[in-house]
Amino acid sequence: MGRLLIVNGSPRASRSNSRRYIEYFLQNWKGAADQYAAVSGGPVSFELYTDLLLVFPLYVDGVPAVLLPFLKTLAAWDGTPRPRVHVLVNCGFLEPEQNQVAVKMVRFFCKRYGFPWGMTLRIGSGEAILDTPFAWFAHRG
């Protein structure tokens, strides 16, 4: 990977579990990375990035509405090469499979607009796991 843009797609951005997962990720990430809070909006220079990591909570079996303006801007960008899109999605349900519909939405978006697909991490019990004896599972390296 070259340069990574990490997009926090949570409506609670600075107070979210998505932010905490981003912090854990960055503790192990060795490359260059920038962060962007979708709820705050603002311009993005997509040409600077080889990879995008979308981190968001599950909202009604899909992506949060605050992430949609970012995706619309990304869809309208006609630059090349296209950054590879990765997803880390978490939910309060025990089963990480609950996140599958949201992942399919992002995969469909990538296919429709010509963005290469990267990796996916679907986390269940997202609200609970970070502050329990099982927290080691979320930040093992």
Report residues per predicted region.
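Glycine-rich phosphate/pyrophosphate-binding loop and the adjoining helix
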Residues: 1, 121-141
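N-terminal beta1-alpha1-beta2 submodule of the flavodoxin-like/Rossmannoid cofactor-binding fold
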Residues: 1-81, 112
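Structural beta-sheet core signal
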Residues: 6, 54, 85-89, 119
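A short, flexible beta-alpha/helix-coil linker loop
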Residues: 11-12, 90-94, 125-127
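Short, solvent-exposed loop/turn segments at secondary-structure boundaries
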Residues: 16-19, 97-100, 132-134
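Charged helix-capping and loop-helix junction motifs
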Residues: 68-73, 99-105
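Ser/Thr/Gly-rich flexible loops in soluble cytosolic domains mediating phosphotransfer, phosphorylation
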Residues: 80-101
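Internal catalytic-core helix/loop-beta-alpha segment
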Residues: 96, 107-108, 112-130
